[in-house]
């Protein structure tokens, strides 16, 4: 296994560990999710380049679109919660339920 794949797997694992440990704030959770998506994007790009299959080159672009949508929704939720409560705690998300 190449060293770059090991580095990407370590980056994904560290982001996942950060998401599990620092889940009290919305901003830290969003940053960990972005790190995971970045690792998946680089990994899928490398796999698509190594496969040399033309249709596989669309997979990283689709993943990037989903990452952008996730970031936009997460930031809008962060702005809404911080404007309403003045804090970015995940515990405030339970108050949004009807």
UniProtKB/Swiss-Prot annotation:
Catalytic activity line of the entry: a ubiquinone + NADH + 5 H(+)(in) = a ubiquinol + NAD(+) + 4 H(+)(out)
Any one of the GO CC terms: respiratory chain complex I
Cited Gene3D superfamilies: 1.10.287.3510
InterPro entries to which the protein is assigned, alphabetical: NADH_UbQ_OxRdtase_chain4L/K (IPR001133), NUOK/Mnh_C1-like (IPR039428)
Membrane-related topology note: Multi-pass membrane protein
Membrane-spanning residues: 1-21, 29-49, 61-81
GO BP term, example: ATP synthesis coupled electron transport
A Pfam family matched in the record: Oxidored_q2
GO molecular function, one term: NADH dehydrogenase (ubiquinone) activity
Localization: Mitochondrion inner membrane
EC category name: translocase
Annotated EC: 7.1.1.2
Record keywords: Electron transport, Membrane, Mitochondrion, Mitochondrion inner membrane, NAD, Respiratory chain, Translocase, Transmembrane, Transmembrane helix, Transport, Ubiquinone
Highest taxon of source: Eukaryota
Xref: PANTHER family: NADH-UBIQUINONE OXIDOREDUCTASE CHAIN 4L, NADH-UBIQUINONE OXIDOREDUCTASE SUBUNIT ND4L
Family, similarity comment: Belongs to the complex I subunit 4L family.
Subunit (UniProt): Core subunit of respiratory chain NADH dehydrogenase (Complex I) which is composed of 45 different subunits.
Function: Core subunit of the mitochondrial membrane respiratory chain NADH dehydrogenase (Complex I) which catalyzes electron transfer from NADH through the respiratory chain, using ubiquinone as an electron acceptor. Part of the enzyme membrane arm which is embedded in the lipid bilayer and involved in proton translocation.
Stated name of the protein: NADH-ubiquinone oxidoreductase chain 4L
Originating organism: Procavia capensis (Rock hyrax)
């Amino acid at each position: 296994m190449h060293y770059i794949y090991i580095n990407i797997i370590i980056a994904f694992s560290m982001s996942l560990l950060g998401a599990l440990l620092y889940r009290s704030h919305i901003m830290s959770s969003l940053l960990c999710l972005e790190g995971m998506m970045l690792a998946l994007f680089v990994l899928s790009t490398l796999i698509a380049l190594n496969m040399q299959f033309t249709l596989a080159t669309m997979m990283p672009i689709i993943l990037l679109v989903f990452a952008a949508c996730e970031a936009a929704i997460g930031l809008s939720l962060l702005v809404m919660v911080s404007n309403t409560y003045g804090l970015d705690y995940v515990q405030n998300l339970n108050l949004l339920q009807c």
